[in-house]
Structure formats: C-alpha cells, structure tokens
A protein has these predicted regions:
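Fold-core signature of tandem repeat domains
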Residues: 110-113, 146-150, 156, 168-169, ...
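Short, conserved beta-strand element in jelly-roll/cupin
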Residues: 56-71, 160-175
C-alpha cells in the first residue's frame, strides 16, 4: 500500500496536470483597445453564439454601452438570461468560471477592464483636489474601483488622480460606438475630458 506521502504527491501531480480553462478574452466579438502592466481594456460584443467555458484570471470592471441579452451558465445550474441596458456598470471576480452566450441581435456591448493587480492597494492617500472632492461621491464603486459617470454635456473640473485611472470618452453616436480609452497615471492633475455634444465620459480610478 502506498504511503500517505506518496498519495499526496500523486494527488498534487494530478491537480497540476488538470486541464486549465482558457481566459475569457480574446474570443470572437472582442477587440483589445489598450493594455499595460496595470490593466487590459477590451471592447466586448456578445455575439449570438455559445462561448467556451472560461475562467476569469483577473477582477473585471467596466460599463455597458449597447443594450442586449446574454445567457450565463454557472456550473450545473440552468442558463440564466441576463438583459442589460446601456450605461450600466459591470464587474466580475478573478477565479469565476462560467459559460456565456449572446442572445440578442444587435448584441450587447461593453468596455470591460481586467485589473492585473491581485489585490487592491491600501496605501493611497486621498488628494485634496481629487475627483471625490471636486466632483462628488463616485457614481459606483466596488473593491477594485471608484467610478464616476460624468453627466452628458459637462466635464470634470481640474482634479488630481491619487490612483491610476482609465477614462472612457463616448461620442454622441446612436447606437453608441467604441469610446476613446486613455490611461491616466497616478499623480496626474488635469481637467476634463470634455465630451462632444451628446457624448458621455466615465472615469475609473483603480484600487
């Protein structure tokens, strides 16, 4: 009979050889619009097809910009139909494994950002001229971001980013199209951005 140590070693080898699910992106309907060592930004459309089972490697944040439907299947549970309006903040967590399927035509579209740091920073001091101070409380937040939806027709006054940030600037096109994406390093002080008439701005400060 094999010793407990041998059994543990065999188990570790089996676990190490277990097939790994692919990451969610790239896949049909997605385009990477920006990447650095902090974040990867994807323009995602849920086409009318069933995507492979995948595991999210990173925490995910973002915002939808075209209304649409998805079917999300988690484990052995039946698929769940999810309908999403435009301009709704999105999130997911690292380690989540599921199947997605587009269920509408035209497809739902969103800008989704993979936050590469495994855990939020806890050593950030708020700037006295930060967005919270000059614009107000975030429109949305979770454990990985503070996010502001700047009202259409307005622009953020001069402010300083205490954290790395991503700005999404949408034109006034209907339906909405892929935004301009700008990475703003921590410590940057600036005004804006200023959208065109009918456009929208979303600012995500990364935790």
């Amino acid at each position: 009979m094999a010793s407990p140590k041998v059994l543990l070693l065999l188990l570790a080898l089996l676990v190490g050889q277990a097939p790994q699910h692919p990451p969610p992106y790239p896949r049909p309907g997605t385009t990477q619009v920006f990447e650095n060592d902090v974040i990867a930004v994807w323009d995602v459309a849920w086409l009318k097809q069933k995507y492979p089972l995948h595991t999210h490697r990173y925490d995910l944040i973002g915002v939808s910009y075209v209304e649409g439907d998805r079917i999300i299947t988690q484990g052995d549970a039946p698929g769940r139909l999810s309908s999403t309006k435009p301009w709704v903040f999105q999130s997911n967590v690292a380690g989540n494994t599921h199947v997605e399927e587009g269920a509408s035509d035209p497809p739902m579209r969103a800008i989704l950002m993979e936050v590469k740091a495994a855990t939020p920073r806890t050593d950030v001091a708020e700037a006295t001229d930060g967005l919270r101070q000059v614009v107000g409380a975030p429109s949305w937040e979770n454990r990985r971001t503070f996010a502001w939806a700047i009202p259409p027709g307005t622009a953020a006054p001069t402010h300083r980013h205490a954290r790395d940030a991503v700005e999404l600037v949408f034109t006034g096109a209907t339906p909405a199209t892929t935004p301009t994406v700008t990475f703003v390093p921590a410590g940057t002080a600036h005004a804006g951005p200023v959208p065109e008439a009918g456009g929208r701005v979303f600012i995500f400060e990364l935790k």
